[in-house]
């Protein structure tokens, strides 16, 4: 779903960066949130989640 937005290496690095316990980074979260929240409503609607694969939403 992010093939046109992010490189595969960037996606893998992001997933690895948050795999450890207590590794939450709010700045990174909000960058990701801004990409997913396509209508800038402040919420991620079901339609916006449809752009993600099943693996990305688990």
Curated annotation (Swiss-Prot):
Annotated EF-hand domain residues: 24-58
InterPro entries assigned to the protein according to its UniProt record, in alphabetical order: EF-hand-dom_pair, EF_Hand_1_Ca_BS, Parvalbumin
GO CC, alphabetical: cytoplasm
Residues that hold Ca(2+) 1 according to the record: 45
UniProt-annotated binding residues for Ca(2+): 37, 39, 41, 43, 48
Residues bearing the modification N-acetylalanine: 1
Molecular function per GO: calcium ion binding
Keyword terms of this UniProt record: Acetylation, Allergen, Calcium, Metal-binding, Muscle protein
PANTHER family recorded: PARVALBUMIN (PTHR11653:SF12), PARVALBUMIN ALPHA (PTHR11653)
Family per similarity comment: Belongs to the parvalbumin family.
Miscellaneous comment: Is regarded as an important allergen. On the 2D-gel the determined pI of this protein is: 3.95, its MW is: 11.39 kDa.
Annotated function: In muscle, parvalbumin is thought to be involved in relaxation after contraction. It binds two calcium ions.
Protein name: Parvalbumin beta 3
